[in-house]
Amino acid sequence: MLSNNIDEEFYYNISKYKTFNEEKFLEYYLESKSLTKPINYIYLLNKINYPHFLSFNENPYLAITNPIILVNPKFYLGDDYIPKNLILVNQFDHIKRDNEMQISNEIVDAYQRLVDFIYLNNQQLIIYSAYRSYNYQKTLYKSDNPYTAKPGHSEHQTGLAIDISNFYYGLSSNLSSSELFKLLSTNAHHFGFILRYPESKEKLTGYPFEPWHYRYVGEDISKIIYQEDLCLEEYFYKYVLLTY
């Protein structure tokens, strides 16, 4: 089957991955010729095994949860999914709101550091929306509102997503032209957060640009996403070996 040493080396490298499919070897090999070197074998496998990953014309699948959660119009959380270690937002300095909003304890320290950074730059930061249960999202959902996700398809159900702004702009599109947005969009990755629905990535995320919506993914991942100008879907396609 293999004609030369280059083929043998390619076969050896790609066959080590658990999603390698012997029957698709020729497809892998031919596609590899269009990729820059060194070959990203994870991306190559994903591209051939899951050619429609970055589109939303398939039936939905349960959310991918490893290494982090991916929720979008294609991947959903069940109605019984409740993140562990939810805590009240109003317990923490700089984050106080007079309501019962909750966030995952996983993001509290990182968010506190982000808020401190914003305050040092003479800006304020307020959480407008955090964790939402499946049932609460059900009450919010309106099929004709592109900013409202279907129940199970909202990142807010993870407890890792927050809508943040200041009192002046709130959750308005005008936030994108503000000094606060400039600070957030160019520095949030230092604290493990990403702008989840960036401008010009709407077809990949499945949602319109939201300058207020940030998602915690951890500093290692957030820095890659920022440096390579990726959205979370592109990160998964490029760096996470898909199995769904």
Which positions does each model-derived feature cover?
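Extracytoplasmic cell-surface/polysaccharide-interacting catalytic and binding patches
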Residues: M1-A130, Y134-Y244
